[in-house]
Curated annotation (Swiss-Prot):
It is found in: Cell membrane. Keywords: Cell membrane, Lipoprotein, Membrane, Palmitate, Signal. InterPro entries: GerMN, Lipoprotein_LpqB, Lipoprotein_LpqB_C, Quino_amine_DH_bsu. It is a lipid-anchor. Residues 1-23 form the signal peptide. A lipid is attached at residue 24 (N-palmitoyl cysteine). A lipid is attached at residue 24 (S-diacylglycerol cysteine). GO terms for cellular component: plasma membrane. It comes from Paenarthrobacter aurescens (strain TC1). This is Lipoprotein LpqB. Belongs to the LpqB lipoprotein family.
Length: 570
């Protein structure tokens, strides 16, 4: 059985060795023109571990423990870890298939002869394309391991592909990196965060990009690279700051000039945080392919911003809240008789939407027109607009099952039917949707739902038909939160703010990131009942009975008393 003290000591020793090496062996950032880095180009200060080789006389339990500890020695294809395997198993074992990250581990004897189980408290699982799945404490996974004696020493003869490493080691060796895809109109860039070994980042990112988006984004985003395009060689060298991406020639030459420009833009965005990469070269069988920029392809918008104004409710009617002033919404008729709550405003038009007083009916309103009823249900989430003017809400359908509905009221003539779509995702079966917020580029949605008293914060992809009409929601990813969140808002393209609102309790909002599995708690504040976010974490607003507050540093500062439920466009 793995002794926790021994495991911590080994991890501490390895981390200390890594730090010492990093401080003594900085890779130069300058050199002769034309100097090439190999396919491992990425972080020049990437940590290197030197795990211990097998020791004579080790027990089966120790061999299993040490084998998985040796998974930190990734350079040159895990040579030390392979020493713990029989010759046959060493040849077939594929460590890059999966990385299992654990909080605690122990070896237990299984029923069969020379068979053992490596029991883990699972923290993450990372697949071959760097897609990470996070698990809450207490999630168990068991790895079966079989050993045999080779020249009097125990060696592993059967083990699944992949590595299993402690969470502390994982956070040192691996880093989260966004690879970028497009929204279906090629207007916006959408981040898809992957976890890669820091030493091999550029090549790993390129392979993952060619393989396509993570499961929760499939169908919601598009790539400039056609399906089936591959690297022509298993490396992406960086020469004098240029990442040389050598692709299969036929697919590259078959692509239009516009598509090649989009390919280059997509790679440039993906490599933008890599310190060695200044620009990108597309190559076909090692020959440079020139990409002409004739101005017809615009770079995609990264981290789409929202206007500085907010919509709010004041004296029972819809108003605009901007620069700490309240003004009427331009050319919008009064809706005071409907008791508006949870207002939302389109980011691209003057259309607004809101719920009635008991939050059972959704209305939309356009300049110069009366409010129009869109749907009535036993309960509804506050409306949220996408950048193509669809307004979304969620609530129980006729059978009680959770439904997500979208309407496009903008431009519909008075009295005419309003286009609408109803979706009943299987993954929402048995759940009550508390909040539904479309991301600013329109390809994803933040979904907060509850079942059996437990809330889940998830991000789903929005699948659309070619004409832009919503069609489906993908199976989501889950972001771990420390609170029983019931509402949230997008902070930027990779972060959301969530909280459990309460007029009578102290509320602690959290920032949850696609990049990091650790929630960031914001300063607590009494009585926060709603939250809104502009452009970035410095523009977070909370509302309580005392007024509207803005996050300032590690606290909250009163902005204005009177208006309630402020919301930025979207």
């Amino acid at each position: 059985m793995l002794r926790p003290g021994r495991a911590r000591a080994i991890v501490a020793l390895l981390v200390m060795l890594m730090v010492m090496l990093a401080s003594c062996a900085q890779i130069p950032r300058s050199g002769p023109v034309g100097k090439s880095k190999d396919e491992g180009a990425g972080n020049p200060n990437a940590p290197v571990f030197f795990p211990a080789a097998p020791r004579a006389g080790s027990s089966p339990e120790t061999v299993i423990e040490d084998f998985y500890m040796a998974g930190s020695g990734y350079e040159d294809d895990y040579p030390v870890a392979r020493q713990y395997l029989t010759q046959a198993q060493s040849v077939t074992w594929k460590p890059d298939k999966r990385a299992i990250v654990f909080r605690e581990a122990q070896v237990v004897k299984a029923a069969g002869e020379n068979e053992y189980l490596y029991e883990l408290d699972l923290a993450y699982s990372v697949d071959a394309d760097g897609v990470a799945t996070q698990f809450p404490p207490g999630t168990k996974e068991t790895i079966p391991v079989t050993l045999e004696q080779v020249e009097g020493e125990w060696r592993i003869s059967k083990v699944p592909d992949g590595t299993a490493i402690p969470e502390e080691t994982f956070k040192v060796i691996y880093g989260a990196n966004p690879i970028y895809f497009y929204d279906p109109t090629f207007t916006y860039a959408v981040p898809d965060y992957r976890w890669f070994i820091k030493k091999n980042t550029v090549k790993s990112m390129t392979s993952a990009l060619l393989a396509g988006p993570a499961p929760y984004l499939r169908g919601a985003v598009v790539s400039a690279f056609p399906s089936g395009m591959k690297l022509a060689r298993e490396s992406v060298p960086v020469v004098s700051g240029a990442a040389q991406v050598d692709l299969s020639a036929k697919e590259l030459f078959d692509a239009s000039a516009e598509d090649r420009q989009r390919m280059q833009n997509q790679l440039a965005l993906t490599f933008r945080n890599q310190p060695d990469v200044i620009n990108v070269q597309l190559r076909a069988d090692q020959d440079l392919v020139r990409v002409e920029d004739n101005g017809t392809v615009l770079p995609p918008v990264l981290d789409k911003s929202v206007p500085a104004r907010q919509i709010a409710v004041n004296n029972g009617d819809l108003v605009r809240y901007e620069n700490n002033r309240v003004t009427p919404l331009p050319d919008i008729q009064s809706v005071a008789g409907l008791g508006p709550h949870s207002p939302a405003e389109s980011p691209v038009s003057q259309t607004a939407a809101f719920l009635n007083g008991d939050k059972t009916t959704l209305y939309s309103i356009e300049p110069g027109q009366p409010a129009r009823q869109l749907t009535t249900r036993t309960t509804l989430t506050g409306p949220s607009f996408s950048p193509n003017d669809w307004v979304w809400t969620a609530g129980p359908g006729a059978t009680g099952a959770a439904e997500v509905v979208a309407y496009k009221p903008t431009g519909s003539a008075p009295g005419a039917g309003i286009p609408s779509v109803t979706m009943t995702p299987a993954w929402l079966t048995g759940r009550t949707v508390k909040d539904f917020r479309v991301s600013r580029e329109g390809t994803r949605a933040l979904v907060i739902s509850e079942a059996n008293g437990k809330s889940a914060v998830q991000v789903t992809g929005i699948v659309r038909n070619p004409d832009g009409v919503p069609k489906d929601l993908t199976v989501p990813i889950t972001l771990l939160s420390n609170s029983a969140a019931d509402q949230g808002a997008w902070v930027n393209g990779s972060t959301v703010a969530v909280m459990s609102g309460s007029a009578t309790s102290t509320v602690v909002p959290e920032l949850l990131s696609l990049e990091s599995g650790e929630p960031q708690q914001l300063a607590p504040w009494d009585g926060l009942t709603s939250i809104s976010v502009g452009n970035g974490a410095e523009q977070i607003y909370g509302q309580s009975d005392a007024g509207i507050f803005q996050r300032v540093g590690n606290g909250w500062e009163l902005q204005l008393k009177g208006p309630t439920e402020p919301a930025f466009p979207g």
